[in-house]
Design a protein with these regions (language model features):
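C-terminal motif of bacterial Sec signal peptides marking the signal peptidase cleavage site
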Residues: 36-38
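Intrinsic low-complexity/disordered segments
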Residues: 10-12, 490-494
């Protein structure tokens, strides 16, 4: 369990799924009795794996396959992402995002507009690895530890464990042993662990100081702890991360059912499911999957083998469709909250895993995004916009807010001399009544408004707001970002005359 003796570290699940699988995969999951925590108090229904797979009719076998495929997908993606990362940096070494425009890491990892991220995959099969976190000073930093299923099992840093330097031994499942003095143990649920550290920055001028802090993070095998170690700093020249993510996903989705479930079975050996997954594990066993053993659909009759392949294809298709579905919005903003710790929501976990996971707990960073104005029209640089916060509706957070505008296809550079980021660190000027207006437009506003200006890229764009260490009002939805207002022609003319 995450440590809670220093500061707030709640991991409450707030389920508000914005995208759901289409039938038939959704039917498979509902039949599998995937009761979502907080959404129902009814006891789980009987698992669909009540009889062995070879005794099923083809339709039931296809349904069973879809359920298990979706359940396995995040573990398969973590494995594929690790293999992609190992082509660029050794296991147990950090891959650093060195600037706000650097795309050396997957999109979900670098989605925060005001942080530099460092990513490392750990293989704990040979024993614990010590993570050395430096003194953070006044800078806000957090380190998320993900298991192989993409759930965050611990968070270190400013919000949870404080700013002091610390040494943490990340131990594999079932490990028992002694640790050096001053080293605290964090038990990992799986042997494959993903570490993502985020260092908050106030803009490009602050990047050099943030990079120096990144260079002070260390990962050391326990057996080597205390010995001299080479400097762990690797600068990666963009682009590449999106390609690596796409390649990882394609590697997984290109597998036929036999190859997919054989790899899944191999990963299960060192990356055990969560204790709460007992119902789903009955489905896994009923399909004929045994940890560490090859999967062979041909042991079924021809119709059964075809049903398994069709079930895998249907699950892939349903995941791809679910990712593309328009999200449910409020005031035009999509705010995912049930991420980072998924409980029994295997569907949501798989949908997030499609884009590479790497998301934070909402308690660390709440990210809202919008691509439309208050009238539902797409945001476009041919217009000017205002984001207005009433005095009592300013973004509720403990460690800052940031606003970014990005192109609809990839990060687009801001106009010359400006950055595509506006944050609380810029000290935007409030109105006389205490309210705040932020100007989203391509061309600079009058001089008196430029401290409140977020430059936008040419063409259609998306606005992304990050609340770091959000307050409860943001987490429980009693606060929502206001809709983006398009300035009328008269207002634009008034601005030009100022």
């Amino acid at each position: 369990m995450p440590r809670t003796d220093k500061k707030e570290n709640t991991m409450t699940h707030r389920h508000a799924p914005a995208r759901r699988l289409t039938k038939p995969a959704a039917v498979a999951l509902s039949v599998a009795a995937l009761i979502l925590p907080g959404c129902s108090t009814a006891p789980p229904a009987a698992p669909i794996a009540a009889v062995a797979a070879e005794q099923r009719n083809p339709q039931a076998l296809e349904t069973l396959t879809q359920s298990v495929y979706v359940y396995a997908f995040p573990l398969m993606m973590t494995d594929a992402l690790q293999r992609s990362a190992l082509a660029r940096v050794p296991a147990g070494r950090f891959l650093h995002q060195r600037s706000l425009d650097d795309d050396a890491l997957p999109p979900a990892v670098r989605a925060r507009a005001d942080t530099l991220a460092s990513s490392a995959f750990l293989d704990l099969r040979d024993g614990p690895i010590v993570l050395s976190v430096p003194d953070l000073g006044r800078r806000h930093v957090w380190v998320s530890l993900y298991d192989a299923w993409t759930d965050i099992f611990d968070t270190l840093g400013s919000r949870t464990t404080g700013a002091r330097a610390q040494q943490v031994a990340i131990t594999p499942p079932g490990w028992t042993g002694a640790l050096p003095a001053g080293v605290r143990a964090v038990a990992a649920p799986t042997s494959l662990v993903w570490v993502v550290a985020r260092v908050q920055v106030s803009g490009p001028r602050d990047e050099a100081a943030a990079r120096r802090l990144q260079d002070r993070f260390r990962l050391t095998p326990l057996e080597d702890f205390g010995r001299p170690q080479a400097r762990d700093a690797r600068e990666i020249a963009p682009p590449g991360a999106d390609i690596a993510l796409d390649a990882a996903r394609q590697r997984v989705t290109a597998l036929d059912a036999n190859a997919y479930f054989t790899r899944f079975a191999a990963l299960l050996k060192d990356n055990p499911p969560h204790p709460a997954d007992s119902t789903m594990l009955e489905n896994v066993r009923a399909l004929g999957i045994t940890p560490g053993m090859p999967f062979d659909s041909t042991r079924h009759a021809e119709a059964g083998a075809q049903a398994i392949e069709q079930g895998a294809m249907a699950a892939r298709h349903s995941l791809a469709v679910a990712v593309r579905q328009p999200p449910v919005t409020q005031n035009g903003w999509f705010i995912p909250r049930n991420i980072g710790a998924y409980g029994l929501d295997y569907e949501q976990r798989a949908i997030v895993g499609w884009d590479g996971a790497g998301t934070d707990l909402p308690q660390d960073a709440l990210i809202a995004r919008t691509s439309t104005d208050a009238d539902g029209m797409p945001l476009d640089s041919t217009h000017r916009y205002v984001l207005h916060f009433d005095r009592d509706q300013l973004p509720p957070q403990n460690a800052g807010w940031a606003l970014a505008a990005v192109g609809t296809t990839r990060r687009t550079p801001a106009p010359a001399g400006r950055r595509d980021l506006l944050s609380e660190a810029d000290h935007p000027r409030p109105n006389r009544d205490g309210s705040l207006d932020l100007y989203l437009q391509r061309d600079p506003p009058p001089k008196g408004r430029r401290t409140n200006w977020l430059p936008v890229p040419t063409g259609p764009f998306i606005v992304r707001m990050t609340l770091t260490w959000p307050k409860e009002a943001a987490l429980d939805r009693s606060w929502l970002p206001p809709a983006v207002l398009r300035q009328e022609q008269e207002q634009e003319q008034e601005q030009e005359q100022e």
